[in-house]
């Protein structure tokens, strides 16, 4: 919060400290605060916005940036000079990390701008931000961004993957090392739930049930 240092708040709330120098396990369901190796020194016209790396999200590792005096996560205010911290909470898999492991990223920006729906419509028309498998530009109405939809047909009946509940530890610094089948089970069209919507003509619709806390 405003006027507070993260290091001082950790003295009040942290249960214990440990080193990441030789590697450490971050357990599923626990919350960790880690001081990052990097500091920033921004001028008054520069600010930052952070977000997890895509690989971090694919492992369901909840990660967000914290700075001293911040009132919002993931935000580095203009002119900030000081340390950076990450809140890390593995949700599905326990992970092995070490000093130098990269879980999130920071974008430095000058000023503030946002792409309007009109600008997105122009890009969609001339570039095709979203396309079909046949490379046709989709004409969907753009509102607060480009809409995306779930594919419940899939390729060869495969529509997604569900994380296994009991798996081995994942070393996040070994990309491409593990077999997908060890951590994920396939979701196919056979897993769809069908509901009879029209008893007169026997038509039905299908959907996928998403269980709470499943990934």
PLM regions: where:
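DUTPase catalytic domain/fold
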Residues: 1-215
């Amino acid at each position: 919060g405003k006027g507070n240092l993260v290091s001082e708040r950790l003295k009040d709330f942290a249960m214990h400290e440990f080193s990441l120098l030789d590697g450490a396990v971050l357990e599923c369901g626990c919350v960790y605060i880690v001081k990052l190796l990097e500091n920033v020194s921004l001028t008054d016209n520069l600010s930052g916005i952070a977000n997890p790396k895509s690989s971090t999200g694919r492992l369901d590792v909840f990660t967000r940036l914290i700075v001293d005096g911040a009132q919002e996560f993931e935000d580095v205010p203009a002119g900030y000079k000081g340390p950076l911290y990450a809140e890390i909470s593995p949700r599905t898999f326990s992970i092995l990390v070490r000093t130098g492991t990269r879980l999130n990223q920071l974008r430095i920006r000058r000023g503030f701008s946002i792409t309007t729906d009109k600008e997105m419509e122009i890009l969609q028309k001339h570039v095709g931000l979203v396309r079909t498998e046949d490379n046709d530009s989709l004409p969907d109405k753009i509102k607060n961004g480009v809409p995306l939809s779930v594919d419940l047909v899939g390729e060869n009946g495969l529509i997604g993957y569900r994380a296994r509940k009991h798996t081995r530890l994942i070393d996040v610094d070994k990309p491409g090392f593990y077999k997908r089948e060890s951590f994920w089970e396939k979701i196919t069209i056979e897993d769809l739930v069908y509901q009879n919507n029209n008893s007169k003509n026997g038509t039905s619709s299908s959907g996928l049930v998403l269980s709470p806390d499943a990934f």
